[in-house]
Amino acid sequence: MQDEAVTENTASTGPQAGPPLVVNVQYVKDLSFEVPGAPQIFAALRTQPQVDLNLDVQVRRLEEQAHIYEVVLAIRAEAVERVEGEEKANTVFIAELSYGGVFTLNGIPDESIEPVLLVECPRLLFPFARTILATVTREGGFPPVQLQPIDFVALWQARRAQQQQETVGNA
């Protein structure tokens, strides 16, 4: 008799929509590694290059009828050697990586979609992008670029603050 009650309760809950966040696929969307001064740069490099990093999160909805999105981490690492007495720095290498994922959101409230796409999805992609960038720079003949953990919450909040300032400025 108890089994019947459990069966009835289970049946009344309806079909499950699946997990709230599904990673459908992850992929390298674009990858570029340039050493403009090769091969001379390897003999001429006198100091540890300074690596300037730029990271952006891009989101695009793939299907209007479903909550399916592409999230891309766009990372640019440019290593330069600043030589004392010279005005212009020498570019050692430029690495650019766009690492993407396709995500399906199930049953996530509308007010939570933006932080999931701009914080949680990049957090899932980041370790893979970090490894790819380190491998590419190492295989390019340089010490691997080791990205430190990124505070995606702070990036998202900064983006929102900038958008609010632009909205106020245009009003």
From Swiss-Prot:
It is found in: Cytoplasm. One of its GO terms (cellular component) is cytoplasm. The keyword Transcription regulation does not apply. GO terms for biological process: protein folding; protein tetramerization; protein transport. One of its GO terms (molecular function) is unfolded protein binding. The keyword Zinc does not apply. Belongs to the SecB family. This is Protein-export protein SecB.
